[in-house]
Amino acid sequence: MKKLLLVLAIAMMVIPSLAQDYTRGRGFFVRPDVYGGFFANVGYQISPYVQVSVGPGALFLFNNTSNNVSVDFVGTVHGGVRVYTSGNNPWSALIDYHVGAFRYNRDPIWRHALVGGASYKDLDFGAGFQMMFAPNAQVFGYGPLVTVGYNFRFYKH
């Protein structure tokens, strides 16, 4: 029960990021982030991984004429490398690449992000940069990204 409450509390955390497009105005994209995935040990302290994160998402765009809000279910596949500290230290460093999609006014928007950060046990913290592309490959938005996520793993490192 305690673990479930922890997961729910972490799921309520959001990933704010700035999205800017000169035709649509300024805005931000938020979503809870809970991961599940596979980790493979290839060295004493290095583990490449692939994860899937899901959750509801919302894109808020502001301009001079109207304010647009799009809420949708968002899925992301991401992978990268973790470097673990030696001994029983619970900290690790990570480099993570995300690719995912969501809908805005019925159009799919592809989101790519590169994130660097740290992990304490199963809780990840990161910062990076993202770009979002509309269906015709035009840049829909871009900007900095802050991430907080929780990992469900099939085994512990």
Annotate each language-model stretch with its function:
Residues 1-4, 20:
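Positively charged n-region of N-terminal signal peptides that target proteins for export
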Residues 26-28, 34-38, 60, 71-77, ...:
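Residues that define the transmembrane beta-barrel architecture of outer-membrane proteins
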Residues 30-32, 54-56, 79, 93-97, ...:
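Membrane-embedded beta-strand positions of outer-membrane beta-barrel proteins
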Residues 34-38, 56-62, 83-85, 99-105, ...:
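Transmembrane beta-strands of outer-membrane beta-barrel pores
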Residues 9, 41, 80-82, 115-119, ...:
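Outer-membrane beta-barrel architecture
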Residues 49-54, 88-93, 122-127, 154-157:
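Repeated loop/turn-to-beta-strand initiation elements of outer-membrane beta-barrel proteins
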Residues 4-14:
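Sec-dependent N-terminal signal peptides
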Residues 19-60, 147-149, 153-157:
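Short glycine/proline- and aromatic-enriched beta-strand/turn motifs that initiate or cap beta-hairpins
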